[in-house]
């Protein structure tokens, strides 16, 4: 997310120097490449590259030129569930060797509470004069696929500062959004905020800001696990989870967002943030059992879907399956903790032959699902579905929601669709002759024709 922040800050009128220790990545960015799939990011980088934003592997030079230094390195989950802060420590140690005058060091990475104090101690350990720095927490609340829009049109900007001097630096940085001036400039990305309704900035303590990030992601993960648990009950009593979620979402106290039943959450944030938040609570002697249940339900949901596939096909050995989707959600190429990848692994171990297609994530998927005798990749979704015994919907890409059902029916061997994302209306699937299995809805929809469409060669 550091690259997104850099592009957006430059669009707000700031000069930004991006630092990465991967020189090949730096060269790629300098040459006009974009290493991640993210809407609007290529356009912003093209607009500001060489003017508002530059790229280097020289951290000391970048720190010397900057008033604020944003840390946006990864904090992966360790074996205990705790966030691994080794990358943070490494970059802070390097920053420390480059500080000669006052700098604001900004935590942008998702970190556990008291990391602010820990960074301060690391800087002290390296001999940095306390009057030469402040450490501020400024958590990001970005969704992959809409990260640029989320940054420029935020629900809130949280600044955890220990004094007014450092808080004022962050206020000035975000002033184009909080004053509304950004939204009046030519070429500004349209969205929820405007000159009349600018972004809101909340100043808190560093500890509060750090917990706001973890608690926010944990609560969103809770909503996802809750609706999936309700979906499993709804399916058992012939109710429809889509109607249930709609009815719940109309309550202004609940709201409709994150009430989508499916395969559970994945990606680089929710899994590790829920685990890290639970670990923090345990370290403080707090029994946060609710977070254990959130994780348990999420893990179970993948097994529930696998069992749906097994139930629909009786046996998986030798079956041809089309897997539509590899990314953990639509509009991204991120496969980290992707339910789709986990489910495909299970299918391969069960002896199924899987042909996968994803609009953006196939190259990344090949790193963890290398081509093999029973694992192939297709150029489009209809090619993936050719002669399939069943089509599995694993990622909620818009392309899949707009599929030509008649064309799909002609491509498959058996008209069976097992939808882990509830992209289709059951009545429409029945009309097109599919056996349709989804999440949290009645299993009564059967194909009008259940025989093979063509002999297998």
What residue ranges belong to the model's regions?
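Structural/interface elements that position substrates and couple domains in central-metabolism enzymes
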Residues: 1-457
């Amino acid at each position: 997310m550091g690259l997104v922040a850099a592009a957006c800050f430059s669009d707000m009128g700031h000069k930004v120097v991006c630092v990465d220790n991967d020189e090949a990545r730096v060269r790629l960015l300098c040459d006009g490449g974009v290493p991640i799939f993210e809407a609007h990011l290529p356009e912003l980088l093209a607009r500001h590259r060489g003017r508002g934003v530059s790229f280097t592997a020289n951290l000391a030079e970048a720190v010397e030129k900057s008033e604020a230094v944003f840390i946006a390195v990864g904090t992966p989950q360790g074996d205990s569930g705790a966030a691994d802060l080794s990358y943070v420590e490494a970059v802070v140690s390097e920053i420390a060797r480059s500080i000669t005058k006052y700098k604001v060091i900004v935590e942008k990475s998702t970190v556990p509470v008291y990391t602010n104090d820990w960074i301060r101690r690391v800087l002290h350990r390296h001999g940095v004069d306390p009057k030469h720095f402040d450490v501020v927490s400024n958590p990001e609340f970005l969704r992959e696929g809409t990260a640029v829009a989320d940054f420029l049109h935020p629900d809130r900007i949280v600044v955890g500062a220990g004094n007014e001097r450092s808080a004022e630096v962050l206020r000035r940085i975000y002033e184009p959004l909080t004053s509304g001036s950004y939204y009046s400039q030519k070429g500004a990305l349209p969205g929820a905020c405007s000159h009349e309704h600018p972004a809101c900035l909340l100043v808190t303590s560093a500890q509060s800001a750090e917990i706001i990030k973890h608690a926010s992601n944990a609560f969103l993960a809770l909503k996802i696990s809750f609706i999936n648990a309700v979906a499993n009950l709804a399916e058992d009593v012939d109710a429809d989870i889509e109607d249930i979620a709609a009815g719940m979402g109309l309550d202004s106290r609940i709201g409709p967002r994150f009430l989508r039943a499916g395969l559970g959450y994945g990606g680089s944030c929710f899994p590790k943030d829920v685990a890290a938040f639970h670990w923090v609570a345990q370290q403080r002697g707090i029994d946060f059992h609710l977070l254990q249940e959130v994780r348990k339900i999420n893990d179970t949901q993948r097994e529930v879907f696998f069992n749906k596939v097994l139930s629909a096909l009786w046996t998986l050995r030798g079956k041809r399956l089309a897997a539509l989707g590899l990314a953990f959600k639509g509009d991204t190429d991120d496969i980290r903790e992707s339910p789709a990848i986990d489910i495909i692994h299970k299918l391969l171990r069960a002896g199924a032959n899987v042909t996968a297609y994803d609009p953006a994530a196939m190259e990344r998927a090949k790193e963890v699902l290398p081509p093999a005798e029973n694992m192939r990749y297709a150029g489009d979704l209809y090619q993936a579905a050719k002669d399939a015994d069943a089509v599995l919907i694993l990622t909620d890409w818009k392309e899949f929601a707009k599929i030509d059902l008649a064309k799909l029916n002609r491509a498959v061997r058996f008209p069976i669709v097992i939808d882990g994302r509830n992209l289709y209306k059951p009545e429409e699937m029945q009309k097109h002759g599919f056996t349709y299995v989804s999440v949290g809805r009645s299993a009564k929809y059967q194909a009008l024709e259940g025989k093979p469409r063509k002999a297998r060669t």
